[in-house]
């Protein structure tokens, strides 16, 4: 595990655990019973961050474990479907299953964690990124 969060978006609290090498989040009851997995093919995810109706996470590696200078941010909706990957490929579902997602461009290096402020801006910290400062992704207004 490389991160954990309590997810109460459904009205019932569960525990979300990042399973980085399995490219997924695993969901457990508060008593430790395994419930399900959220598959994120190609995304070696870090700590899940629950904010309002979404889950946000840094992706430390993309495509292949330990791939140098890769990574992006992934955002899942209230149905646990990937809806956006800043710095990564557009999510595509086929027969209800997420196709592999990967870094697109070279904005990020090993996104290791994210946090959000009250306005919904995302702050991304990077690991092993030659001393790079955190990056702020500003939320655009919905119109």
Describe these PLM feature segments.
Residues 58-73, 134-135:
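Short, conserved, GDST-rich strand-edge loop motifs in beta-rich repeat architectures
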